[in-house]
């Protein structure tokens, strides 16, 4: 099973990716993780990527694609993989398809977790974290017993900069510009499947499992 996972920030992709990886015994390949691994191991591509990152520049497609290609040739990908965070553009998707076709491992499904913007804003802006022990809360879905105080250590709860409304809206705007053309690309290829991401974790995973079971 070879899967691309798509969805906006706050859609729960990380949670679902872990569950999919465990159930179908395929590696969850996050581009962030493989970038960090290549930089840490000082591979030629990692060194090149670090040079761009250190200069505050976007890593060019050829470097990103090279790192992903290298990861997909590992033995643990023989029976499939779940790609999370790549591709981000149609150009990257085309390069990935060309590579996978060349090794006879074409994609089975592009899985899109759909969540309305208002739901994501509520989900992400409501998150709070303890400044001391790192415990996580949500002002609506998992509130602390005392407002603004951690249940565990009684220290202050804060909203991270990444969870402010302005930052979340900015990330959603970037996602829309980048990903809508990508969604249309996979629709044209006939491999996209959509899941409602507003349901519970178990319900979303149940729907994903049904889709992946059909596509096996």
From Swiss-Prot:
Organism taxonomic ancestry: Bacteria, Bacillati, Bacillota, Clostridia, Eubacteriales
The kind of enzyme this is, by top-level EC class, is transferase
Pathway in which this enzyme or protein is active: Purine metabolism; AMP biosynthesis via salvage pathway; AMP from ADP: step 1/1
Q: Which reaction does it catalyse?
A: AMP + ATP = 2 ADP
- Tell me which Pfam families the record gives: ADK (PF00406), ADK_lid (PF05191)
Residue sites binding ATP per the record: 10-15, 127, 136-137, 199
**Where does it live in the cell?**
Cytoplasm
Q: Which family does it belong to?
A: Belongs to the adenylate kinase family.
- Which UniProt keyword terms apply here? ATP-binding, Cytoplasm, Kinase, Metal-binding, Nucleotide biosynthesis, Nucleotide-binding, Transferase, Zinc
Known Gene3D superfamilies for this protein? P-loop containing nucleotide triphosphate hydrolases
| Domain observations | Consists of three domains, a large central CORE domain and two small peripheral domains, NMPbind and LID, which undergo movements during catalysis. The LID domain closes over the site of phosphoryl transfer upon ATP binding. Assembling and dissambling the active center during each catalytic cycle provides an effective means to prevent ATP hydrolysis. Some bacteria have evolved a zinc-coordinating structure that stabilizes the LID domain.
Which molecular function GO terms apply here? adenylate kinase activity; ATP binding; zinc ion binding
Gene Ontology annotations of biological process type: AMP salvage
Per the entry, what this protein does is:
Catalyzes the reversible transfer of the terminal phosphate group between ATP and AMP. Plays an important role in cellular energy homeostasis and in adenine nucleotide metabolism.
Record protein name field: Adenylate kinase
Q: Which residues bind Zn(2+)?
A: 130, 133, 150, 153
Q: Can you tell me which residues bind AMP? A: 31, 36, 57-59, 85-88, 92, 160, 171
Supply one GO CC term from the record: cytoplasm
Which EC number(s) are documented for this chain? Answer: 2.7.4.3
């Amino acid at each position: 099973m070879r899967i691309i996972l798509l969805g906006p920030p706050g859609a729960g992709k990380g949670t679902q990716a872990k569950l999919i990886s465990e159930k179908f015994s395929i590696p969850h390949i996050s581009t962030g993780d493989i970038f960090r691994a290549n930089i840490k191991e000082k591979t030629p591509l990692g060194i090149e990527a670090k040079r761009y990152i250190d200069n505050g520049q976007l890593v060019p497609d050829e470097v990103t694609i090279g790192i992903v290609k290298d990861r997909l040739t590992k033995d643990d990908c023989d029976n499939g993989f779940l790609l999370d965070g790549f591709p981000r553009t149609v150009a990257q998707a085309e390069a990935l398809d060309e590579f996978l076709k060349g090794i006879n491992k074409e994609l089975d499904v592009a899985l899109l977790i759909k969540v309305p913007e208002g739901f994501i804003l509520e989900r992400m802006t409501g998150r709070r974290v303890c400044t001391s022990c790192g415990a996580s809360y949500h002002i609506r879905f998992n509130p602390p017993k005392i407002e603004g105080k951690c249940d565990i250590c009684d220290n202050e709860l804060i909203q991270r900069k990444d969870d402010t409304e302005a930052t979340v809206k900015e990330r959603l705007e970037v996602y829309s510009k980048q990903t809508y053309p990508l969604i249309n690309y996979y629709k044209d290829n006939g491999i996209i499947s959509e899941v409602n991401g507003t349901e519970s974790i178990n319900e979303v995973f149940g729907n994903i499992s049904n889709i992946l079971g059909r596509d096996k």
